[in-house]
């Protein structure tokens, strides 16, 4: 029998509901939901109970588990029928903590860089689909294309040829209004140069441009700003990494393919970020394998296990493995990211799971 019976021996109260929910643990951060102040707006209406669970990210991968355990706790401890329990989910994405607060991009909770040790591993594909997947989960997301020598975000997001506008900011300085598509705010050097014109800039010029894109673009409010970094470990990549570290970068996600030549370059990239004291969030393996659409047979075109071995070596989580799919490629070419497609070889749910895993990783870093 619960804490109160159907006969009304003990009246249903907010206190009893909170006591029941205090037995539910936050599965990743530890501690119970009540102590972490994640339970809000408890309401009692006869035998009906409703409340909100304030998650640390709208892309929480364990939302279903939390909901089931809340229902079980209220049902078994408070004696309320499951059909009389109503749970709403909200989220409060905690801004990047620590000494970088003063330098943080105004209105942006987390700045996350997506990098690669070499070109051709699908870093921009991961960046765009990760950004859209986070938005699909309910997050407010921006995408900054910092790959100045190969800006592909305008094409991959279907906004080629568009140009951002500017307005006067509160301090009288011009503020750029980002281009928007698929629920994402975007900025790219590709909006400012012709497609067939070369971009011949050195590191300091690129760093200055990046700073302008961070502080003179009207990003706010954002939960996550995803930055598509230039590949490699050369002057430009190093300069950008140092610049981002100075503005409170939450961390970096590194993208690789399975083969050794790619993971070797990723190791160099990881070492570069370590040298400039940037937190490493994890590794994504792109083009992990190919499933033939006519036979269903799997082919490990670029080998297998490379990212997993690298993750174990570096003590980093393997955030996701994205298969090679024709719809992933065609979606990038057509400006329709794969994550919004229902084609089997678009692997939309795989991208969404990557987004949830990354969001959980950031939450653990900030709330633990």
Spans of model-derived segments:
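Residue-level signature of catalytic and energy-coupling elements of molecular machines
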Residues: 21, 39, 60, 74, ...
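Phosphate-binding loop that captures ATP/GTP phosphates
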Residues: 134-196, 201, 207-211, 308
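Extreme N-terminal, non-catalytic leader segments
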Residues: 35-38, 43-49, 56-115, 362, ...
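Walker A/P-loop phosphate-binding motif and the immediately C-terminal alpha-helix
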Residues: 111-148, 270
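N-proximal, solvent-exposed amphipathic alpha-helical segments enriched in charged/polar residues
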Residues: 2-40
